[in-house]
Amino acid sequence: MSTAGRPHFGAFGSQPVCYHLPMTTTPADHSASGAERPASERKEPTFLFTEKYVADKSELARRFLDTRERLNANVDKANNFLVKRVYNIDHNAYLEGSLPAKTKELMGLVASACLRCDDCIFYHAIQAYRLGVTRAEQEESLNVALIVGGTIVVPHLRRVYELLEELYG
């Protein structure tokens, strides 16, 4: 009986073995494969606008940023190691690297819209604005979210379009 086209299973027969993935990688593997840049090569993005500027420009953004700051203070008081780790991973994921921070924020915007997280949508729309992403780029990204996420994304689009109107006019 031929096994062509079927995954090969390991010694216990329960987990497929993926022979196309290297078991270990070296820095040379990363550069050759185009994988993520090492941490030493990633850097903080350059924001064109401060959070204060955004808050002064948009009432929706101001309310969101104020609430986020207040709620984050409550989380910080808990001094939870795991939460700090997740926050750190999140921060590092959006640093400049092989992908520009603008692209990463638009990816975050699309994922957040598909997941229907209004706080996340507002956060990424504001960050993208601060990085100099145009309204057209944000709207085109939201079109992708609508296709991927389906019509259930529409109520969230309505809210973020209101924010975009306040930010971009």
List PLM regions with ranges.
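Extreme N-terminal basic, low-complexity initiation segments
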Residues: 2-9
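Aromatic (phenylalanine/tyrosine) cluster motif
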Residues: 9-12, 19
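Acidic, glycine/proline-rich low-complexity segments that act as flexible tails and inter-domain linkers
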Residues: 18-103, 156-169
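Residues in soluble alpha-helical coiled-coils and helical-bundle/repeat scaffolds
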Residues: 94, 115-116, 133
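Alpha-helical scaffolds flanking conserved acidic
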Residues: 101-106, 136-141
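Short, thiol/selenol-centered motifs that function as redox-active sites or metal-ligating centers
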Residues: 107, 111-123
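Iron-sulfur (Fe-S) cluster-binding segments and ferredoxin-like electron-carrier domains
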Residues: 124-135
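C-terminal binding/interaction regions
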Residues: 135, 141-154, 158-169
